[in-house]
Amino acid sequence: MTLLPNERIDDLQFRGLKIIQNPQYFCFGMDAVLLSHFARLKKADRAADLGTGTGILPLLLWGRYEFRHMTGIEIQSNIADMASRSVSLNNLDEKITIINEDLRNFGFGSQAGTMDAVISNPP
């Protein structure tokens, strides 16, 4: 796994999951961990994380529920790239997709109306 300058791999201490973070941008906090305990997903669920950031919610929720698929949408290209690499680091490319897009321009296309859950951790 290639790390960019100032990036690190943090062990989530949960089901062997790891995340790539860069303290010069943003590192997840307790709010993401707490939110992951409030969201309820089923194994067959398809979900979206709006403003996924580093991808912490999809990773934590995968660890809890092993959902069918989650799409994380992030506007910042460097953060979306970091989230995508975290997904790959955990071998979850078939379960979590990170899309670098502005939510105002994003259309779910053929996925429209097919999400079982939508989550977001507002700033």
PLM regions and their residue ranges:
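Class I SAM-dependent transferase core
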Residues: 2-43
